[in-house]
Amino acid sequence: TVAEVLGLDLSRVRVVTGDSEVVPKDNGSYSSRVTFMVGNAALEAARNLKAVLTNAAARKLEARPEDIECLGEVYRAGKQDKGATFEEVVTEALKDTGTITVTGNYSTIPESHGGKKYRGSAIGGTMGYSYSAQVVEVSVDEETGVVTVDKVWVAHDCGKALNRLTVEGQVQGSVWMGMGQAMSEEAAYHDGLMVTANMLDYRVPTIQDSPPIEVGIVESNDPHGPFGAKEAGEGSLAAFLPALTNAIADAIGIRFNDLPVTPDRVFEAIEKRRRAAEKSPKKTGGA
């Protein structure tokens, strides 16, 4: 976002994280809103910085600010053959201000919640909604209850994909998180004591558990997102859970309403169905 607005190569942008001495307070990364909120804040900061640099370039090139363009890190006024490099413009700007500091911020806009006041936690209203569709292919071993995810297909609407490789990786990570929630991760208690209090019993998926994941990035344009972007996180996590249970129901004819769908629960459900079938009176033919 910053590089796009300033017309710079991405390698010039360095992100400083976790240093409260030089960056403002941040409430954290959650609620599938970071690209939307941080992206818009960065967009505003970049535009403020662009105004500073444009004015400096105008002084150096003896032109009007509105005539200044920056292409390939070279500032030019109109059809001038010779322009000023990014370094020259920054040097010119430093003469006026010393260290150049700009800020940008973003607050949830009223349109996000129907123009009305909203109540709840301090995270604010939802700015935009993403959409995700998922297909999960599974194999179920009815002798052991083990469910194996063979392949996952995901289509995720993230608005404008600012970085397609990052979006693809984010969606894949969301599928893994959904796998953990749906298949193995459980905060189980017995007599008030947590019995899954270590990483052996509270099992999270590893790369060994990962099936092939085919990601389809569906681009749309959110009118309030930075360059039209939305989230690419929890949407693909949430879609895995019902897709998995529907796939299991299709495979063995048993629907699960409790998560995680562990092997013991699958085996118990299969045994329960078998015992019920044995107890039910057999149908006999007759006239």
Predicted regions and their residues:
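Cofactor-binding beta-sheet edge motifs in enzyme active sites
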Residues: 1-287
